[in-house]
């Protein structure tokens, strides 16, 4: 017995077969301009063959009364398996306070095809006495999305 198949169904199946491989192969790239859920911005330069990168970070929040200044960041991306959604870490050496923040996370392509950086951070502030060590480290999470230019 022969079944007639709808031309529309065949077209749909063919479309899915052609589009699906492209969606799964898209690689999340750290390079570029990013903004997080608090309004902080960072720019990450090109990732070299060893997975190393540099950039700048300008925070939108601070616990100090000092003027916020753009601060350098240095990091690495895991390159062992050339994954499409790589893990990474970077350090920000704040230029306006005696503190350093380390971020670790993963670069994802979300269900809408957008790049997202899901991160966790530790901020270490300087204290004058070891007795104050307990209050010197803070922990948090940030979600970064690619900062779009007006042309996009």
Swiss-Prot record:
Positions contributing to biotin binding: 57
One Gene Ontology MF term: biotin binding
Domain Avidin-like positions: 26-149
Modifications made to the protein after synthesis: N-linked glycan at Asn-41 consists of GlcNAc(beta1-2)Man(alpha1-3)[GlcNAc(beta1-4)][Man(alpha1-?)Man(alpha1-6)] Man(beta1-4)GlcNAc(beta1-4)GlcNAc.
Official protein name in the record: Avidin
Compartments, as annotated in UniProt: Secreted
Role, per record: The biological function of avidin is not known. Forms a strong non-covalent specific complex with biotin (one molecule of biotin per subunit of avidin).
Domain of life: Eukaryota
UniProt GO BP: antibacterial humoral response
Cysteine disulfide links: 28-107
């Amino acid at each position: 017995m022969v079944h007639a198949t709808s031309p529309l169904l065949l077209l749909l199946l063919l479309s899915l077969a052609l589009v699906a491989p492209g969606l799964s192969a898209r690689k999340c790239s750290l390079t570029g301009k990013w903004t997080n859920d608090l309004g902080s911005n960072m720019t990450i330069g090109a990732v070299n063959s060893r997975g190393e990168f540099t950039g700048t970070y300008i925070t939108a929040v601070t616990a100090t009364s000092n003027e916020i200044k753009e601060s350098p960041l240095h990091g690495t991306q895991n390159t062992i398996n050339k994954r499409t959604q790589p893990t990474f870490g970077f350090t920000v050496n704040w230029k306006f306070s005696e503190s350093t923040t380390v971020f670790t996370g993963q670069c994802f392509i979300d269900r809408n095809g957008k790049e997202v950086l899901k991160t966790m951070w530790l901020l270490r502030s300087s204290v004058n006495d070891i007795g104050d060590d307990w209050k010197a480290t803070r922990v948090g999470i940030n979600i970064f999305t690619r900062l779009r230019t007006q042309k996009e």
